[in-house]
Amino acid sequence: MTRRRSRPSGGAGRRERARAAGPQKPQAPEPPPPPSLEAGAGAGPPEAPAEPDHDGPREDDEPNLVPGPQVPPASSQPVQTCCLLCHRERKGWEEGPSQNGLVLQGEKLPPDFMPKLVKNLLGEMPLWVCQSCRKSMEEDERQTGREHAVAISLSHTSCKSQSCGDDSHSSSSSSSSSSSSSSSSCPGNSGDWDPSSFLSAHKLSGLWNSPHSSGAMPGSSLGSPPTIPGEAFPVSEHHQHSDLTAPPNSPTGHHPQPASLIPSHPSSFGSPPHPHLLPTTPAAPFPAQASECPVAAATAPHTPGPCQSSHLPSTSMPLLKMPPPFSGCSHPCSGHCGGHCSGPLLPPPSSQPLPSTHRDPGCKGHKFAHSGLACQLPQPCEADEGLGEEEDSSSERSSCTSSSTHQRDGKFCDCCYCEFFGHNAPPAAPTSRNYTEIREKLRSRLTRRKEELPMKGGTLGGIPGEPAVDHRDVDELLEFINSTEPKVPNSARAAKRARHKLKKKEKEKAQLAAEALKQANRVSGSREPRPARERLLEWPDRELDRVNSFLSSRLQEIKNTVKDSIRASFSVCELSMDSNGFSKEGAAEPEPQSLPPSNLSGSSEQQPDINLDLSPLTLGSPQNHTLQAPGEPAPPWAEMRGPHPPWTEVRGPPPGIVPENGLVRRLNTVPNLSRVIWVKTPKPGYPSSEEPSSKEVPSCKQELPEPVSSGGKPQKGKRQGSQAKKSEASPAPRPPASLEVPSAKGQVAGPKQPGRVLELPKVGSCAEAGEGSRGSRPGPGWAGSPKTEKEKGSSWRNWPGEAKARPQEQESVQPSGPARPQSLPQGKGRSRRSRNKQEKPASSLDDVFLPKDMDGVEMDETDREVEYFKRFCLDSAKQTRQKVAVNWTNFSLKKTTPSTAQ
């Protein structure tokens, strides 16, 4: 029919027009309705016949509602295209509300019209509102929109769906009770109704979908399940509308339905939603619409009126909101309930404001789970967005459309819900950012709670735990008591834990005592046999314990010694420099080779506390260099190596190696360590290493004179003096320091060496490994002019060597008499060696980790094995240490490395 004609052409067109003419909603009812009517006619000719019966009177009452697929054949007249409420042509609407249950523009539905609406709905009365319906709806909406603006937030999403349902229902009723009519009327409605008119297309489609899935559902939710798709839906629609005044709750209940209905209704409002209705069985769309409309009516108090006014009321609520935004009947259609409802349902129009709010709920639809349909369709959402009077602006803003669009973009519509609930929300309710204040409040609360808890916990916890009878020490109890305020609960727990621990300890003690008694009994019973067995069995453990305790004590002593040497870092630096210089001098002469060992022995023996590390360095560096550069002009770095040549001697391999052999030394660092072991155990590495103590001590003295004879004699002289001092003075490091001081003066190595020396303590056992790397590096340095580098390298090498050489020195110090004419230094060395032995545990890491000289020392098999093992570890670790050599450049750069070296 004409209405169909309008619907097919105006289904989508109306939607577009509705969007474009959203601002025109007041006028939209009539102009859009013709397309809506055309669409509705196409879609709902059957509806038109059905609607005339139900909506005839309404059509008469509502000539504006004429446009609408729901208009009966008589109502197919394009008086006003289709009314969104009635979706009927003007004629259909003109037929009068009595016929179609539609209210004429000027006519308001009487309160008793609800039965008529029910009948009309059963007869598929048109739901879409004509201009008159829309105007009435707008008025009612304006009145009730403000009242229900708040209620609309939840209900008006339902209202949307209901309004949409009503609109589609009205159009469906107008078209015919046949399902096809309803579906066509839905399309007609959508065609007549501007998509932005009332509900989002998504909402409508959702409403329609849910009604389609169960047309009676919306109706049932409204309390009037749709019967036949056409009739039943109108009935449910009527019931819903009758219930609409109450249904503001229902809208919430119907929100899900509106979600389905609204998308369909957008179909009725806009061609797309209407097609949705069409795809669905008309009956289902109608029930959906009916239920939807009822939902809208329920959401809006006026909806009952709309139901009475051939479901125009339910849509009139939207109409009131939507029509002004929408131009032509399509907007009225979208607000079909509003237009028709306004007349019969002035109170429902307040509900209709809910639908108009429903527009906002369009947004709210997406805001609320119930109103999921609300914002789904951008078009209806616009219509939905307006709350009461805001509806027009909302639809104009097309906030629903924008909301859905923005939602897609991750944004949200500007509806009040979104604004309030923070899609594009204003900042959340201001919360105190005064964290200190909050913290204090929380703290005070916690303190109060703790105070209360201690009272409770004291009584409760005290009852079970009897803190008075606590097993903890008095000090612990006092601490606990004193700290109760801050940690009452914690202390209670801690007290429990402590008690448990004490109990466990007591149990363990009791068990141990019992075991001891048992063992004592056993031992007494089988003590003699057991001692042999147990001793044999326990011997390894005891030996391990003894060795471990000895090593740990030694390690501690070594650590202390290292710390002392680091503390004396400046003097140690000087010593290192002197030792290095001396090593260099010694390196210049072959004798220094032996001298460095004596140096090592002397320095390690004499400076074990400070320079235990240095003495090993001295050994490593002087020996290496003395052996390496006995006759070379590397006296400076020979002095630098002075400590290292002993290493070279200890190594024995680089006797002819030049100072450049710093690299060799480095490579031979492991050999140095092993040779240090040699020096200690096997004398073969060097003559002085044969008798490390005696030879080294003499070699120390020799080294002093030899360095003098070799290049860098002033340093040698100093070195000699320093070595003599070393031999004389228990702390050999200081003489090396004096030697170093000259070399430091001559070379920058003094300060650098201190860092190295400092680091040497750090390096400790690792220094040996580093020593190898140092050896190679410092070797070039020594070969090079910078004694500093050489000294550093040698002292560092010596450091590792020192660790190794120190045991050698200590061991060699004991046999210090052999090669050195100056027996006093030897004797001192020996005494130093003894001292070192005594101090080793506390003085030197080398003492702990470096193998001792096995030759001149009496050892148990266990100790000897331990020493062999140490040597093995040194040999293997040396290489590794070489690989893991420290970046000595940093140390040379940092004079404060001694502390870091620790």
Curated annotation (Swiss-Prot):
Known tissue expression: Isoform 1 is up-regulated in both embryonal rhabdomyosarcoma and alveolar rhabdomyosarcoma cell lines.
Biased amino acid composition, Acidic residues: 382-393
Pfam families assigned: FAM193_C
Segments of skewed composition (Low complexity): 170-185, 263-283, 682-701, 775-786
Main location: cytoplasm
Pro residues bias: start-end ranges: 26-36
Top-level taxon of the source organism: Eukaryota
Protein known as: Protein FAM193B
Organism whose genome encodes this protein: Homo sapiens (Human)
Classification of source organism: Eukaryota, Metazoa, Chordata, Craniata, Vertebrata
